[in-house]
C-alpha cells in the first residue's frame, strides 16, 4: 500500500501518569475508532500500535508494549494513521456524510461548467469550506487560482463520490467571479 492509502487519525501528546498513558489528540470525526485492540500505523514505519486501553473522558491511551512512562515517551508527537479501507469499515457515516478523503480531488461543476477541483476542506466551526483549485480555463481568464465554496445546501446540490464530482448551484460561479 502507498501513502495515499492511509489517512491521519490522531496525534500523540505528552505522557500522563507513570503507567505509559499518552494524550491522544483526535484528528478525525470518529472517536469511536479508538478502542481496545484497535491498531494504527506510525508514519514512515511498518510498526503498528495496538490499543490496550483508551480513556475517552480524558483522551488518554495506553498501547501494548508501551506500559511504562519511559517507553511511552518514544510515542510523543507521533502521528497515527489508519488505512482508508479500515476507516470505511470502522467509521459509519450518516446519510449525506462523506469522508474527507472521498471529497478531495473531486471535480466541481456548475451545470456544465467545470469550476475546478477540491484540494482541501477547512472547518469553520459552523460548517465546512471546500478549497477549490480553479480550472486552468478560468485562471487564463484572470479569475483567481483558488476560491472557496461553503458546504451548504445553498451552494452544493449534489455530491457523486462514484464519479468524483460535486455539482453546485449558480451561486458557486458567482463566488469564483468575486473572489
Swiss-Prot record:
GO terms for cellular component: cytoplasm; ribosome. Keywords: Chaperone, Cytoplasm, Ribosome biogenesis, rRNA processing. Signal peptide: none annotated. Its main location: cytoplasm. GO terms for molecular function: ribosome binding. It is found in: Cytoplasm. Gene3D superfamilies: PRC-barrel domain, RimM. InterPro entries: PRC-brl_dom (IPR027275), PRC_barrel-like_sf (IPR011033), RimM (IPR011961), RimM_N (IPR002676), RimM_N_sf (IPR036976), Transl_B-barrel_sf (IPR009000). GO terms for biological process: ribosomal small subunit biogenesis; rRNA processing. Binds ribosomal protein uS19. An accessory protein needed during the final step in the assembly of 30S ribosomal subunit, possibly for assembly of the head region. Essential for efficient processing of 16S rRNA. May be needed both before and after RbfA during the maturation of 16S rRNA. It has affinity for free ribosomal 30S subunits but not for 70S ribosomes. NCBIfam families: 16S_RimM. Belongs to the RimM family. The PRC barrel domain binds ribosomal protein uS19. This is Ribosome maturation factor RimM. It comes from Campylobacter jejuni subsp. jejuni serotype O:23/36 (strain 81-176). The gene is rimM.
Amino acid at each position: 500500500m502507498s501513502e495515499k492509502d492511509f489517512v491521519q487519525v490522531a496525534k500523540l501528546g505528552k505522557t500522563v501518569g507513570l503507567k505509559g498513558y499518552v494524550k491522544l489528540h483526535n484528528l478525525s470525526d470518529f472517536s469511536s475508532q479508538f478502542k481496545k485492540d484497535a491498531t494504527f500505523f506510525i508514519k514512515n514505519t511498518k510498526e503498528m500500535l495496538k490499543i490496550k486501553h483508551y480513556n475517552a473522558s480524558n483522551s488518554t491511551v495506553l498501547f501494548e508494549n508501551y506500559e511504562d512512562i519511559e517507553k511511552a515517551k518514544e510515542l510523543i508527537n507521533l502521528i497515527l494513521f489508519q488505512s482508508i479501507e479500515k476507516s470505511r469499515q470502522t467509521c459509519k457515516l450518516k446519510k449525506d456524510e462523506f469522508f474527507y478523503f472521498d471529497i478531495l480531488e473531486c471535480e466541481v461543476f456548475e451545470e456544465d461548467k467545470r469550476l475546478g477541483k477540491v484540494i482541501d476542506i477547512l472547518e469553520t466551526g459552523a460548517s465546512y469550506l471546500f478549497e477549490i483549485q480553479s480550472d486552468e480555463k478560468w485562471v487564463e481568464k484572470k479569475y483567481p487560482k483558488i476560491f472557496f465554496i461553503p458546504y451548504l445546501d445553498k451552494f452544493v446540490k449534489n455530491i457523486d463520490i462514484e464519479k468524483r464530482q460535486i455539482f453546485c448551484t449558480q451561486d458557486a460561479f458567482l463566488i469564483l467571479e468575486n473572489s
